[in-house]
């Protein structure tokens, strides 16, 4: 069974939508990605889980997958993924808006292909982010899309959060 292979370590990346980093509250998970690191073959495989998938969450019954984290933290999310999808998770990493931006900025940004409709759609989540980060309105807006655009952390987060352009949550999961 590849999901329980001793040469493979599965790391769950949890993207939390928590905006206030000064609270102990949990947000929902906007992104849930599993990185499978194969030590033998020296390969990495990434699997995305749809946040709105309807699953059984322990004693809470049926709900959207992203509610598992909100209800019981990373442990309940792990249990739900393991029970529903049959995956084995060895470790997890949680990022929120601020840490996501910091990681992308630390590596010098990320190159992405961005369509014109995506560039326009990014303005709404970026307006919220700019307010949270005490940045001037309009900061980091893209004038238009393009190929291999160098996005900073704020722009990359807005791109990853974009959900009402294209095929809704399916394209959002692809962007993440």
Q: Can you annotate each of these PLM segments?
A:
Residues 1-176:
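Non-catalytic, solvent-exposed segments at the cell envelope interface
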């Amino acid at each position: 069974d590849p999901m329980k292979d001793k040469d493979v370590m599965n790391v769950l990346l949890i993207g939390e939508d928590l905006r206030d980093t000064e609270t102990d509250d949990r947000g929902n998970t906007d992104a849930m990605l599993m990185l499978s690191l194969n030590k033998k073959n020296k390969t990495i495989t990434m699997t995305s889980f749809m946040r709105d998938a309807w699953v059984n969450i322990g004693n809470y019954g049926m709900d959207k997958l992203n509610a598992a984290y909100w209800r019981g933290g990373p442990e309940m999310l792990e249990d739900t993924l393991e029970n529903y999808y049959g995956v084995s998770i060895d470790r997890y990493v949680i990022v929120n808006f601020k840490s996501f931006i910091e990681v992308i900025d630390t590596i010098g940004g990320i190159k992405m292909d961005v369509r014109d409709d995506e560039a326009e759609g990014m303005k709404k989540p970026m307006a919220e982010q700019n307010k949270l980060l005490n940045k001037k309105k309009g900061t980091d807006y893209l004038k238009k899309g393009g190929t291999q655009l160098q996005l900073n952390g704020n722009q990359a987060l807005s791109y990853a959060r974009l959900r009402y352009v294209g095929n809704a949550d399916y394209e959002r999961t692809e962007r993440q």
